[in-house]
């Protein structure tokens, strides 16, 4: 006797190339990045956002300037400023917003990530 078992299929994950804007890079963030690039005196720089293991919640965000673009990088442009995200990091950042905020407590780049299940108190690490 043969028994067939039907397993539910996993929901399909959208391919970032099929999304109009897989990540939101705000005007405020672009303006600050432009300012920082001008200080570095290198027009070829782009802001790379990435995810790495670490922090109190398991993953943490990283930011760095980069002149190199990989063929599979997501390249977003806002107001002439380029944001780069590698495919591995992008899977954790789909739908997120990269912003820059200034307040009485200081100024910083902020990632609002709808995929993060928990975040630490400082907001720089998260878990999925």
Curated annotation (Swiss-Prot):
Amino acids binding iron-sulfur cluster:
56, 120, 122
Note accompanying the cofactor annotation: Binds 1 iron-sulfur cluster per subunit.
GO cellular component terms, A-Z? cytosol
GO BP term, example: iron-sulfur cluster assembly
List the Gene3D superfamilies hit by this protein, alphabetically.
Answer: HesB-like domain (2.60.300.12)
What GO molecular function terms would the record report?
2 iron, 2 sulfur cluster binding; 4 iron, 4 sulfur cluster binding; iron ion binding
Q: Which domain of life is it from?
A: Bacteria
Q: Which UniProt keywords apply?
A: Iron, Iron-sulfur, Metal-binding
- Tell me which InterPro entries the record gives: FeS_biogenesis (IPR000361), FeS_cluster_insertion (IPR016092), FeS_cluster_insertion_CS (IPR017870), FeS_cluster_insertion_RrpA (IPR023063), HesB-like_dom_sf (IPR035903)
Name any cofactors this protein relies on. Answer: iron-sulfur cluster
The record ties this protein, via HAMAP family, to: Fe_S_insert_ErpA (MF_01380)
Known partners and oligomeric status? Homodimer.
Q: What does this protein do?
A: Required for insertion of 4Fe-4S clusters for at least IspG.
Task: Kindly give the PANTHER family that the UniProt entry links to this protein.
Answer: IRON-SULFUR CLUSTER ASSEMBLY 2 HOMOLOG, MITOCHONDRIAL (PTHR43011:SF1)
UniProt family annotation: Belongs to the HesB/IscA family.
Supply the name of the protein. Iron-sulfur cluster insertion protein ErpA
UniProt source species: Xylella fastidiosa (strain M12)
């Amino acid at each position: 006797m043969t028994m067939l078992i039907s397993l539910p299929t996993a929901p399909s994950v959208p391919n970032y190339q099929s999304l109009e804007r897989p990540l939101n890079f705000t005007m405020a963030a672009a303006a600050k990045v432009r300012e920082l690039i001008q200080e570095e005196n290198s027009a070829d720089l782009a802001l790379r956002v990435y995810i790495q293991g670490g922090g109190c919640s398991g993953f943490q965000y990283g930011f760095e300037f980069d002149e190199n673009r990989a063929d599979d990088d997501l390249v977003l442009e806002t107001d002439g400023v380029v944001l780069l995200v590698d495919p591995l990091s992008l899977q954790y950042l789909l739908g997120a917003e990269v912003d820059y905020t200034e307040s009485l407590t200081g100024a910083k780049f902020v990632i609002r990530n709808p995929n993060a299940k928990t975040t630490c108190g400082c907001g720089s690490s998260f878990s999925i």
